[in-house]
């Protein structure tokens, strides 16, 4: 049974402008340690990376029914990968608490896609099945 679903789309150029303006302050606020290790150095690749991560985090907040409220931080949601390279959510802090509040056996599914101008993500939270 689906217990939560969220989606988000982000303009890569928006992330490029934010990163050019705020630099490391943006990455320190937005990314967790897992993600910082994967961040590309080259500017265009970095902007696309940030857009994908931002979309994944926003989609997760929506799936959890939370948004950036009640103590939620950007770093409470990180994107890692399983052994096959498939993206996985790694939740901590308030995000992990909200997921636990949905009951036992809730799994998360994350899909991320991007093109030159946009990045998008979909998160589905499923119990059982």
UniProtKB/Swiss-Prot annotation:
One GO term describing the cellular component: cytoplasm
Annotated Pfam families: ACPS
Keyword field contains Glycosyltransferase: no
GO process terms (BP): fatty acid biosynthetic process
EC number per UniProt: 2.7.8.7
GO molecular function, one term: holo-[acyl-carrier-protein] synthase activity
EC class of the enzyme, as a word: transferase
Cofactor(s) recorded in Swiss-Prot or TrEMBL: Mg(2+)
Location relative to the cell: Cytoplasm
Reactions catalysed according to its record: apo-[ACP] + CoA = holo-[ACP] + adenosine 3',5'-bisphosphate + H(+)
Binding locations of Mg(2+): 8, 58
Keyword line: Cytoplasm, Fatty acid biosynthesis, Fatty acid metabolism, Lipid biosynthesis, Lipid metabolism, Magnesium, Metal-binding, Transferase
Annotated coiled-coil segments of the chain: none
Cystine crosslinks: none
Family: Belongs to the P-Pant transferase superfamily. AcpS family.
Classification via NCBIfam families: acpS, pantethn_trn
Function: Transfers the 4'-phosphopantetheine moiety from coenzyme A to a Ser of acyl-carrier-protein.
Protein name, entry field: Holo-[acyl-carrier-protein] synthase
Organism: Acidithiobacillus ferrooxidans (strain ATCC 23270 / DSM 14882 / CIP 104768 / NCIMB 8455)
Name of the gene: acpS
């Amino acid at each position: 049974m689906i217990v939560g679903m969220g989606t988000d789309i982000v303009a890569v150029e928006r992330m490029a402008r934010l990163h050019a303006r705020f630099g490391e302050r943006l990455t320190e606020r937005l990314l967790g340690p897992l993600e910082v290790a994967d961040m590309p150095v080259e500017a265009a690749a970095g902007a696309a990376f940030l857009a994908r991560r931002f979309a994944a985090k926003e989609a997760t907040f929506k799936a959890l029914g939370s948004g950036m409220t009640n103590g939620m931080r950007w770093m409470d949601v990180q994107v890692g990968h399983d052994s096959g390279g498939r993206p996985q959510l790694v939740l901590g802090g308030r995000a992990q608490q909200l997921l636990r509040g949905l009951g036992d056996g809730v799994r998360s599914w994350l899909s991320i896609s991007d093109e030159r101008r946009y990045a998008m993500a979909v998160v589905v939270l499923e119990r059982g099945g």
